[in-house]
Structures are given as structure tokens and as C-alpha cells.
Design a protein with these regions (language model features):
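N-terminal "first-domain core" detector
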Residues: 1-40
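Short, surface-exposed, charged amphipathic helix/loop patches that serve as local interaction elements
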Residues: 25-134
Length: 134
């Protein structure tokens, strides 16, 4: 295999910024974990836009730059749309959110935890009711 090199950042001349061509899976997961905390579309979209911008421009450790962002202006000017167009896997954030909120995942998690969830019920039935064990 050929030696792998870190991909070069892409310059977006319209906004004078450089962005990574791809988000890392861990970054997508962090965005997803924050998005699912919110219930309204606007809060979710703002979280996706800002966090994608922060990770794509690699300013995650620069709190002063993050605090200086003017979300509404950036949104009106199309900064977030341009970044999503440039970062090839930005759409994976929406897939991650859909997966995290899927019924199949919820059922799988319930099934995994069902024995633990039933223990208190078994104890109550043993003390106060009738429990048939097979």
C-alpha cells in the first residue's frame, strides 16, 4: 500500500476559510450526541451547523473564536451550506442522528437491559404476589 498522507484542507475563497475534506467518525458521533439532546428542528440544525463548522475548520480548541461566531450572519451568508457542500461526509451527521433515534436501536437497547429491568419486578412479586418460574 502506498504511504497515506493527511488530506489537504480545502480553501473556500468566498469566506476566506480552510476546511477539512472529511469529518472523523468520532467528530460525527460528538455532533450526533449533542443534536439528540434537542427537540426542535431549529436547535438541532443550529447544533449541526455550528459543530460541523467547528470541526471542519479545526477551531474546536479555540474557545475565543467559537464565542465570536455570529450564527445568524453566517447562516444568512451561506457559510454553513458551503461547508456542508465541501465536507464530503457531512451528510453522515444526519444518518447518525437517524440511527441514534431509530426504533430498532431502542428495541435493541431495551432487549439488552431487559433482564436487569425485570429484577425489581421479580422481587416485588416474590414478596407480595405470585411469581411462576419455569
Amino acid at each position: 500500500m502506498k504511504e497515506l498522507k493527511k488530506p489537504e484542507r480545502i480553501y473556500i475563497e468566498d469566506f476566506d476559510i480552510y476546511v477539512k475534506p472529511r469529518l472523523l467518525d468520532a467528530e460525527i458521533q460528538k455532533i450526533c450526541n449533542n443534536v439528540i439532546k434537542f427537540k426542535t428542528w431549529a436547535e438541532r440544525e443550529k447544533t449541526i451547523n455550528l459543530m460541523t463548522f467547528i470541526y471542519a475548520t479545526e477551531i474546536a480548541d479555540k474557545e475565543d473564536e467559537i464565542n465570536a461566531l455570529n450564527y445568524d450572519l453566517m447562516s444568512e451568508c451561506g457559510v454553513f451550506e458551503k461547508i456542508k457542500e465541501t465536507v464530503v461526509n457531512s451528510g453522515d451527521v444526519y444518518k447518525a442522528v437517524a440511527f441514534s433515534e431509530s426504533t430498532l436501536l431502542a428495541l435493541s437497547q431495551i432487549a439488552d437491559n431487559l433482564p436487569e429491568m425485570l429484577e425489581p419486578i421479580k422481587e416485588v412479586l416474590k414478596r407480595h404476589g405470585r411469581l411462576t418460574e419455569e
